[in-house]
Amino acid sequence: MNAAKIKCRALMVGDWCCDQHGFPMQITNVGDDYAYATFEGNEGDPWEFDDKDAKPQPIEITEDILKQNNWEVQGYTLLPNEHYCVKYIGKYCFLWSLGTLSIWFDHKHYNDGLIADIIVSCKYVHQLQQVLRLAGMAEMANNFKI
């Protein structure tokens, strides 16, 4: 199981995280030191995370999760390491490499490669969801599947 923990206030409504057993849940409410979450089949009784005893844990981005959201490899580029392009959305390019999804903002093709004004790397699903929201893609972030 992943040893990383998240502070409750670092989450946003709609973010995916899991409990200490790896059970995935989606955040429904966030406070300073607590967060409530729900999961498929839940009958309205929210799960409570807190920063002391029941800390939320991140869900690592995997190839399977990307495929579940219809993000498929569209090509690759050789930078320092191999990066597989999994999605283009307007001025954004999403590259997958070694367990990390990088979002290239305002990317351009240059000398048979890519350059970008800003590059944000995400290892966890909740990080990706928050970057998508900041980039104006809230619908995609809130409908992300695990």
Whereabouts are the PLM-identified features?
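SH3/SH3-like beta-barrel fold
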Residues: 35-41
